[in-house]
Amino acid sequence: MFRMWGKIWKDNHLLKDTVVENDAKDTRTHKIFQALEEICYDFDLGKPIWLSSTVSEFQRHSKTRFRKDSFIEEIPFDYLEIQVIEEDDFYDL
């Protein structure tokens, strides 16, 4: 099972969080984008733009932060953080 945790932070306080699960037989990349889309839907946000810094941070740590410069519209928080908390087993694919 693939699980991603989405969190909204402001002034070092957690305002909202949600966990998205995905059991589909799909690539990791597709699961990440689908989970991010669901997190943004739950939080009523537009989808953030993946900057080179967010991509490289996510590739290294399976975790990244989308700050104000990643969103087209104004956001009332400091950043949206996403983190993969459970990966599919390689042998299950």
Give names to the regions the model predicted.
Residues 1-21:
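Short, extreme N-terminal segment that most often corresponds to the first beta-strand
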